[in-house]
Amino acid sequence: MNRLVIVDCEAPYGCASPATGDMTEFGAVHYETRASFHGKDCSRETMQFFDAWVRSVTPGRAIFVSDNNGYDWQWINFYFDKYGISNPFGHSSRRIGDFYAGLKSHFFDQSSWKQMRVTKHDHNPVNDAMGNAEALHKIFARKNVK
């Protein structure tokens, strides 16, 4: 589990993708240590620091985990690509809700896991990523996931 990094991205309301605007900030939490990273913008320097941070907290290729990976991963991948930085997550990601639905054998139960968050979901991306990491810890413990 030491390769898991939980990520949350924020963008202005109505901004659905990098084609229509810019990410305003993002947060990441290392699953095992709960070390965090706060990207306060989407500049080249921030993405370089994020790349270095991810590589420092994970052995081998990091695994991108998110509440909504279709949304969050597109932003992170876009800015890594924009600045010519190799994405430390590669071209894949994992969604907590889909994993949880599979564990419960209930295809449509993709959000009840959110009740397991401890840190309040307040759209501060570090807090949101931390809450998701906390919930994932509980899911793994309850289901004896290795």
Regions found by a protein language model. Give the residues of each.
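Short acidic, Gly/Ser-rich segments with clustered Asp/Glu that frequently serve as metal-coordination loops
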Residues: 9-18
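A conditional alpha-helix N-cap/helix-loop micro-motif detector
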Residues: 40-47
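Metal-dependent phosphoesterase core characteristic of DEDDh/y 3'-5' exonuclease domains
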Residues: 2-4, 21-24, 30-38, 51-146
